[in-house]
Amino acid sequence: MLNVPSQAFPAAGSQQRVAPAGQSRNKVVLKPGHSLLDWIRLTKSGQDLTGLRGRLIEVTEDELKKHNTKKDCWTCIRGMVYNLSAYMDFHPGGEEELMRAAGIDSTDLFDEVHRWVNYESMLKECLVGRMAVKPSPALQAHTEKTESTHLNGLSAPPSLRPEPLSAPLPAKDHRPRYDWFQTDGTVNIVVYTKRKIPSAGCAVVDLQDDNLRVEMLLGRMSYLLYWRLSSRVQDHVDVQTAHSVGKVQLCLRKSVKEKWTQLGQSLEHHDTFIQCKDRGLFYRECVLLSKTDVTHNTQLLRLQLPRGSRMQVPVGRHVYLKTSVQGTDVVKPYTAVDQMLIPPSQSSAEVGSDIHLMIKVYPDGVLTPHIANLPIGASLSVGGPEGSFTLRVLRDVTHLYMLAAGTGFTPMARLIRLALQDFTVIRKMKLMFFNRQERDILWQSQLDELCTKEERFEVQHVLSEPADSWTGRRGRIDACMLQNFLERPENSKCLVCVCGPAGFTESAVQLVRQLDFSEEELHVFQA
């Protein structure tokens, strides 16, 4: 399906390109002159990429079906129709993959691959028009009275996009609820999630002007509260979490000490409980506070959220960085990490006020060199969090095994801390960490220190291109290596987590299955 050139979304072979286990996606080598930057230049050249000379039309289903060849390929995404013909040779998934979208509504196909891709920006010069909506029988008699839609200057505003179908809700008793109360100087909102909350938290709060958006990330489900507040409040939100009882309390300070008669006006999707994958991404502007070298080509970024925002990123979830490169929005997911693997005894940072991201800089990339060159104090749009990992997979696990390659280590970092802090039933956790050279190992000294402090934790480093002085394991992942690593003691419950470049992940998953681990005992981290 529609994808983006490999340098930016993300770099070829990075762990962010991994599909679910068993659903590998073929990549093709792009011809010279067909990178993302080349595509951006083409869209800025003034060349007619739609074949309509700037006209925007309304497209019927029958008309869409006619455009189903490589040289004449239209597709519909969220109600908007695009001509993909010019993009064929720029698509890293290849022509065959892109042709799956030819002549049809490809929204679901697109969402299967990378729903976070900003196709509106990438394909804005390929916009043919809007999909004609078939009136329902009940409305048929009234169509003559409706005003025709003007298509000049057509874009894809959120109001035109069909709302995704929500998944069946869990039993009513499990649906979160909220309440609120006030004092002379504060307004307090209490959310009862009706489940235990992990130590990492689950609340994402954004106060922008008078609008308050509160999202609870509860496993695969998202609970959203959204108001235009009755009166002004100060631009700071206190978030307190009672983890064991599943309660989250927000405290807002009133700008004027007066009694509120109501909390505010409900906004779009207020008090909804749907699957996370069906919830649209919400972006906020963050400030780059610091960049720290982790290795020769990897940096740890610290981003500060706006004063009115708090983000508790659940373990295994990623956020999206968005910035403009030559006038085109470029977006890429990154797994949130902690500031360090071993937490300091005291920290001055307020929980949820900062985000830390570990980013490998690809010299030929589009986004990562741009980020690496940003000055301290620069702004970056951050969306999410999002991801499929839930703590349910850790239930009753006694042996946790992690197979990571390169920056595929990032989701493992917080998983290790979570397991050590919150899951005493886990008797053993082992990380096998694959890299090319010793200088590529992320947080090597911290991993070694953790091994000495925590008898439950063990790390084995494997290098494919080691120096002669290297005394550790050598080579690439294979069956013999895993057979000795993935022990299955009597009366144990095991979980194997995998993350890394696509080739590594596919090999690891295949080898783990050959060792008779079930699908329930295997989790692949993916974007």
UniProtKB/Swiss-Prot annotation:
Residues 281-392 form the FAD-binding FR-type domain. Residues 1-24, 138-171 are annotated as: Disordered. FAD binds at residues 372-387, 399-431. GO terms for biological process: superoxide metabolic process. Its cofactor is FAD. Its main location: endoplasmic reticulum. Residues 56-132 form the Cytochrome b5 heme-binding domain. Heme binds at H91, H114. GO terms for molecular function: cytochrome-b5 reductase activity, acting on NAD(P)H; heme binding; metal ion binding. PANTHER family: CYTOCHROME B5 REDUCTASE 4, CYTOCHROME B5 REDUCTASE 4 FAMILY MEMBER. One of its GO terms (cellular component) is cytoplasm. Its EC number is 1.6.2.2. NADH-cytochrome b5 reductase involved in endoplasmic reticulum stress response pathway. It holds the Pfam family Cyt-b5. Belongs to the flavoprotein pyridine nucleotide cytochrome reductase family. Keywords: Endoplasmic reticulum, FAD, Flavoprotein, Heme, Iron, Metal-binding, NAD, Oxidoreductase. It comes from Danio rerio. It catalyses: 2 Fe(III)-[cytochrome b5] + NADH = 2 Fe(II)-[cytochrome b5] + NAD(+) + H(+). This is Cytochrome b5 reductase 4. Residues 173-264 form the CS domain.
